[in-house]
């Protein structure tokens, strides 16, 4: 793929991830799960897409730009540290989890959601200088199972649709990962 096409695809995916992240602010998830800081992680659908179809390097680039721009547009420096730490840890775990033959996209997504929460707890511990925050982690990990599964289900549905549409960048995906998507 040439540089211009790769850059355009990365910019489009970053914009999509930013849009999903912004849209997620309007979903009243606290009505269902009354815990502070809980989000669905819809932008992770884009990260999963990039990881599976375009590679970990592209996924990392999209993650960096999304976290940076998202913080500039509506979060500030503290939000950046929460977002980038959770995102980097989630991506690293998903890169490793994807290699496990028994994990589908659902499992990879749940692992990423759990890692994201761990990353955010680590930032909170540093900011508050208190280990008591770790008491909140079990609740976040339980939520990660649900949100990670939902994000994985959305990703799997999107992936199946893209493979069925026979998009050019999905040909390798079908041969390699189609069994692990379902």
Task: Give residue spans per PLM region.
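Hydrophobic transmembrane alpha-helices
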Residues: 1-49
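Generic transmembrane alpha-helix motif of multi-pass integral membrane proteins
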Residues: 40-56, 93-98
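Interfacial aromatic-anchored transmembrane helix boundaries in multi-pass membrane proteins
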Residues: 21-40, 65-95, 105, 125-137
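Alpha-helical transmembrane segments of multipass membrane proteins
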Residues: 17-21, 47, 90, 94, ...
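Positively charged n-region of N-terminal signal peptides that target proteins for export
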Residues: 1-5, 57, 99
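Hydrophobic side chains within alpha-helical segments
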Residues: 27, 42, 47, 69, ...
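Membrane-embedded alpha-helical hairpins and interfacial helices in multi-pass inner-membrane proteins
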Residues: 34-36, 76-81, 99-182
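Hydrophobic alpha-helical transmembrane segments
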Residues: 7-12, 45, 60-64, 80-85, ...
């Amino acid at each position: 793929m040439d540089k211009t096409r790769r850059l355009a695809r990365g910019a489009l995916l970053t914009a999509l991830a930013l849009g999903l992240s912004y849209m997620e602010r309007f979903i009243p998830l606290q009505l269902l799960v009354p815990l502070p800081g809980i989000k669905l992680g819809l932008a992770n659908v884009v990260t999963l897409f990039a990881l599976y179809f375009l590679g970990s390097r592209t996924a990392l680039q999209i993650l960096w730009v999304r976290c940076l721009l998202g913080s500039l547009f509506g979060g500030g420096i503290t939000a950046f540290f929460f977002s980038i730490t959770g995102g980097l840890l989630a991506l690293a775990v998903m890169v490793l989890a994807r290699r496990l033959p028994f994990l589908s996209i659902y499992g990879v997504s749940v692992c990423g959601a759990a890692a994201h929460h761990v990353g955010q707890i680590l930032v909170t511990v540093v900011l508050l200088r208190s280990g008591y925050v770790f008491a909140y982690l079990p609740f976040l990990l339980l939520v990660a199972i649900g949100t990670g599964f939902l994000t994985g289900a959305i990703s799997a549905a999107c992936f199946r649709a893209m493979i069925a549409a026979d998009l050019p960048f999905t040909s390798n995906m079908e041969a390699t990962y189609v069994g692990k998507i379902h």
